[in-house]
Each structure stands twice: as structure tokens, then as C-alpha cells.
UniProtKB/Swiss-Prot annotation:
Keyword Ribosomal protein: yes
Gene Ontology CC entries for this record: cytoplasm; small ribosomal subunit
Protein name as it appears in the record: Small ribosomal subunit protein uS19
Family: Belongs to the universal ribosomal protein uS19 family.
This protein's UniProt keywords: Ribonucleoprotein, Ribosomal protein, RNA-binding, rRNA-binding
Entries under PANTHER family matching the protein: RIBOSOMAL PROTEIN S19P FAMILY MEMBER (PTHR11880), SMALL RIBOSOMAL SUBUNIT PROTEIN US19M (PTHR11880:SF8)
InterPro entries xref list: Ribosomal_uS19, Ribosomal_uS19_bac-type, Ribosomal_uS19_CS, Ribosomal_uS19_SF
GO molecular function: rRNA binding; structural constituent of ribosome
Protein function: Protein S19 forms a complex with S13 that binds strongly to the 16S ribosomal RNA.
Length: 92
């Protein structure tokens, strides 16, 4: 179920303050654990480091990302490939 339009997008207050003080063209990377925050137009041009549970993944916000959540750009799980077929290994 989508979020109600009358509520508006959710952005953590502490993250919004940091983005406003740093400005869009700042070289400084802002670290955040707030994966649930929605990217708004104020975030365009800002470099963020989004935590994935283990480390911080660098994310540079562009216009195409507006409306998405920060967590979408820092995957929490790594895919190492499917297990090989044991039968084919034994026959060789």
C-alpha cells in the first residue's frame, strides 16, 4: 500500500538538517543509517554514504533517484551464485 499523498514523503529530520547545512555541491560525504528516508529534490547533487548493515555504500544522488528510498541503492545481501550440480562433478 502506497503512502498517502496528504502526508508527503518521509525524511528523517536529522538527515534533512545535514543536507541543508552542507549544500548540494559540497565535497563532504554525509553518513546515514536512515535507509527509510525518501529522496527529495533537495538531495540532488549530494553525496551520501548509506549503511547496509555492514558498511557504508557511497551514493551520489541524481534527478532520476527522486521519489525512491535511500535503502534501494545500498543492497544488504550479496549473491554468490547458485550451487553447482553435484551429479555432473562426480561423473567426470
Amino acid at each position: 500500500m502506497a503512502r498517502s499523498i496528504k502526508k508527503g514523503p518521509f525524511v528523517d529530520g536529522h538527515l534533512m538538517k545535514k543536507v541543508e547545512t552542507e549544500g548540494p555541491n559540497s565535497k563532504k560525504i554525509i553518513k546515514t543509517w536512515s535507509r527509510r528516508s525518501t529522496i527529495t529534490p533537495e538531495f540532488i547533487g549530494v553525496s551520501l554514504a548509506v549503511h547496509n548493515g555492514k558498511k557504508f555504500i557511497p551514493v551520489f544522488v541524481t534527478e532520476n533517484m527522486v521519489g525512491h528510498k535511500l535503502g534501494e541503492f545500498s543492497p544488504t545481501r550479496t549473491f554468490h551464485g547458485h550451487a553447482a550440480d553435484k551429479k555432473s562433478k562426480v561423473k567426470k
